């Protein structure tokens, strides 16, 4: 046996031991999950994870291997959380639309082992998470070309019981999908979500193709496929074309080549760890109040990555504001910032904590 064979044999022997230890570890995870279920505890415990990772690193004598072992332990904890969620019946995530929608693609990237549950509208996604029908909801929040999804931000404002616990940036390639064999000259009408239409505006104007908005891109593709009409086309992903038996006639028709949609993950469980946090607040209608808020944020040393305003529902000419800040939400400075903003703002609440 040469050196390579000996090394491989050693790896196989260690893997056999790891398999037995993995089963032993997952049995302990099951006990933890059952305890959490009995006591109504959340799956994710950020403080516990941090302690486990530090203890894991300390066990490795070879300093060069410590970061790799921490990654290994983090992966094991991620698997454990997925298993706990499944055991607790929380391994369900909601999205708007049908299979193949960009939200469905984002959900699959975020929760590869979860049951994806489809709802017709964003409102119903929020309601599903709020009721506990699903553990999470995945909805679009903003696009690098078409801007923010205002309706989703309004839903965040109207659901104070929900938290944003993660974000996911999905590169978007909008494609012109048609029935097999269709030529561009045959097309008379295009269907897609309003955001996809806006992202493809230059192409549509160039070929003078009128567009009709639909609830999402995958539903538009399904509609075109079921219509059997070669004069109709959809704007959607290449994955959607494969799902519904369509062809990509023209790829990447979006105006912005670097087209990205940010999705947010909703949960009833309050997040604790991250390097970004977002706030929603309202102000008295007095001169300089918004400037005062910005000064407070600056005085505490936080970088403000985003600020948006939206009309308050049922209150004419009054607004609420959204800000995203860079920093540790668990730091003492953050608690002090929120206390001061509580005096400066009419209302203020923490919306999300996540890592970017």
What does each model-identified segment do?
Residues 1-356:
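Domain-level signature for soluble enzymes in the chorismate/prephenate branch of the shikimate pathway
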């Amino acid at each position: 046996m040469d050196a390579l064979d000996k090394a491989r044999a050693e790896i196989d022997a260690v893997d056999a031991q790891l398999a037995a230890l993995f089963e032993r570890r997952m049995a302990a995870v099951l006990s933890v999950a059952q305890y959490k279920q009995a006591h109504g505890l959340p799956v994710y415990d950020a403080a516990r994870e941090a302690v486990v990772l530090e203890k894991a690193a300390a066990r490795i004598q070879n300093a060069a291997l410590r970061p790799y072992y921490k990654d290994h332990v983090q992966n094991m904890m991620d698997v454990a959380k997925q298993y706990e969620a499944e055991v607790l019946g929380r391994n369900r995530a909601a999205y708007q639309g049908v299979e193949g929608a960009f939200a469905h693609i984002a959900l699959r990237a975020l929760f590869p082992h979860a049951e994806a549950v489809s709802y017709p509208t964003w409102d119903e996604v929020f309601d599903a998470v709020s009721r506990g029908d699903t553990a999470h909801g995945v909805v679009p929040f903003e696009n690098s070309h078409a801007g923010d999804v205002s309706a989703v931000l309004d839903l965040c404002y109207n659901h104070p019981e929900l938290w944003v616990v993660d974000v996911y940036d999905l590169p978007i390639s909008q494609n012109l999908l048609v029935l097999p064999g269709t030529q561009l000259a045959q097309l008379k009408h295009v269907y897609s979500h309003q955001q996809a239409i806006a992202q493809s505006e230059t192409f549509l104007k160039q070929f003078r193709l009128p567009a009709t908005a639909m609830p999402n891109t995958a539903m538009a593709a399904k509609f075109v496929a079921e219509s059997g009409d070669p004069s109709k086309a959809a704007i959607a992903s290449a994955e959607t074309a494969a799902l519904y038996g369509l062809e990509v006639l023209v790829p990447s028709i979006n105006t912005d080549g670097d087209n990205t949609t940010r999705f947010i993950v909703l949960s009833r469980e309050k997040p604790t760890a991250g390097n970004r946090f977002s706030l929603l607040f309202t102000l008295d209608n007095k001169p300089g109040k918004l400037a005062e808020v910005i000064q407070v944020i600056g005085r505490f040393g936080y970088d403000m990555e985003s600020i948006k305003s939206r009309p308050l529902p049922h209150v004419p000419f009054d607004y609420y504001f959204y800000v995203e800040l860079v920093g540790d939400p668990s730091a003492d400075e953050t608690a002090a910032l929120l206390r001061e903003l509580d005096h400066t703002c009419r209302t203020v609440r923490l919306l999300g904590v996540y890592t970017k």
